Curated annotation (Swiss-Prot):
Gene this protein is translated from: mtnC
Protein name per its UniProtKB record: Enolase-phosphatase E1
Catalyzed chemical reaction(s): 5-methylsulfanyl-2,3-dioxopentyl phosphate + H2O = 1,2-dihydroxy-5-(methylsulfanyl)pent-1-en-3-one + phosphate
Pathway stated in the Swiss-Prot or TrEMBL entry: Amino-acid biosynthesis; L-methionine biosynthesis via salvage pathway; L-methionine from S-methyl-5-thio-alpha-D-ribose 1-phosphate: step 3/6; Amino-acid biosynthesis; L-methionine biosynthesis via salvage pathway; L-methionine from S-methyl-5-thio-alpha-D-ribose 1-phosphate: step 4/6
Annotated EC: 3.1.3.77
Amino acid sequence: MIQFVLMDIEGTTTSVSFVFDVLFPYFRDNIQSIASRAEEPEIAAILKQVQDLALTETGTSLDQTGAIATLHQWSVEDRKVAPLKAMQGFLWEEGYKNGDFRGHVYPDVLPKLKEWQKEGIQLGIYSSGSVKAQKLLFGYSDYGDLTGYFDYFFDLKVGQKRDVQSYQAIAQAVQLPPEAILFLSDVPAELDAAIQAGYQAWQLVRPGTTASPTHQQVTDFGAITSLH
């Protein structure tokens, strides 16, 4: 019996276009604004992480301007690195709170969250976006604050989403056997890693998603039948 449903965000609970057409451009349009605030502790810590990672990866020593430019470039490349995700979360928080945008959630998601919560099934998010960014998206969603439906939020601190060890670590964190966990994602490689860890895993085939012939599929949350 499934006791925990773990969900991806982009392409699963949320439209890919919201991320690529709203969130990413907002970040790139506003990244230069942090130059005048580089002494703020949170910003300074993230820039230091950028400098450390650049030094490790390329041997390049970056000044503040170079670190900001690198964040912009990483965003263009959609790099899955922690400093970028942290800075995105920082700037997106301001956008959400200013009402510049609201977090997109597919209309079929909330009814299922309510149903699962009522049945006593625990719910969690696992995304490459930082936990902060995850909570902002669901906290300022089209349907209001949905964060109360989720028991856990996981990001890249637990590991990369295509690594089996990441899903093993999540199972340990929620203190459940892997076979009691259902993972929902649109990405076959992520589903494969979860399955190798012992999870059940289904592919969400949203508009624009290529269906995988090797995975169980649903087109929306409403198509997910009883988990008992």
